[in-house]
């Protein structure tokens, strides 16, 4: 499993100086008045160097123009709150309006518990944005890294036209111990790994980090849709 920051992953995939971040002005607020949440957010900003758990923008990968989003796992475990959901929704809306594909890199523990039902609502919001993008015939490549769990798995992360994962990444909804306790069964050692998901048809391929730039560029080039903007 390869541990990289959100920006490291975008820079690695992108052509030199190609990435332009957008929607960075959207910031978290304590809408439910959860005690200590503002302080927690400030600590996470200082620790991660990011303002939120996801970065979105426009880039090119071997000359192929695309929208991109990437989760920052060191910001509250890459959890999806209202800001992450809003930014993912907006990047898909931008891609749909501008006839661009989307490359998404997920490293998330799931919905952010401090935002309660507002966090869970982001599952529907992001899934709807992906659907509108797909309805226009545009391409979405989803890259699952360790971990991809909970609300991320149950929404946008598993809706790619092509879904790939890094070796040995944990991919699932509930955690292993929860599943074992609820099912009263002993699960296989490879349960919820990328290899398990590939074997059972939930993902399309396993691609090591070092091979992703070539792979993603090839997928973008060979999955162009009619009318797609490559300028």
Feature locations, PLM:
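General structural feature for long, well-ordered alpha-helical segments within catalytic domains
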Residues: 6-9, 40, 84-87, 91, ...
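Intrinsically disordered, low-complexity segments enriched in small/flexible residues
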Residues: 1-50, 58-61, 219-231
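A structural preference for short, pocket-lining loop segments at secondary-structure junctions
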Residues: 59-72, 87-111
């Amino acid at each position: 499993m390869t541990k990289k920051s959100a920006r490291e992953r975008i820079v690695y995939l992108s052509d030199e100086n190609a990435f332009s971040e957008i929607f960075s002005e959207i910031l978290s607020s304590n809408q439910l008045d959860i005690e200590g949440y503002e302080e927690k957010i400030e600590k996470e900003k200082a620790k991660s160097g990011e303002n939120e758990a996801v970065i979105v923008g426009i880039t090119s990968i071997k000359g192929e123009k695309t929208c991109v989003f990437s989760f920052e796992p060191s910001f509250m475990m890459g959890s999806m709150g209202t800001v992450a959901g809003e930014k993912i929704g907006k990047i898909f809306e931008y891609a749909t309006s501008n006839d661009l594909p989307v490359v998404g890199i997920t490293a998330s523990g799931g919905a952010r518990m401090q935002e309660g039902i507002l966090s869970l609502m982001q599952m529907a919001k992001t899934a709807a944005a992906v659907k509108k993008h797909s309805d226009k015939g545009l391409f979405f490549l989803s890259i699952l890294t360790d971990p991809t769990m909970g609300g991320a798995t149950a929404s946008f992360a598993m809706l790619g036209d092509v879904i790939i994962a890094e070796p040995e990444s944990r991919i699932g909804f509930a955690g292993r111990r929860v599943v074992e306790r609820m099912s009263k069964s002993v699960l296989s050692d490879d349960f919820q790994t990328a290899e398990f998901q590939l074997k059972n048809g939930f993902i399309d391929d396993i691609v090591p980090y070092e091979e992703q730039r070539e792979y993603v560029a090839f997928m973008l080039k060979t999955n162009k849709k009619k009318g797609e903007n490559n300028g």
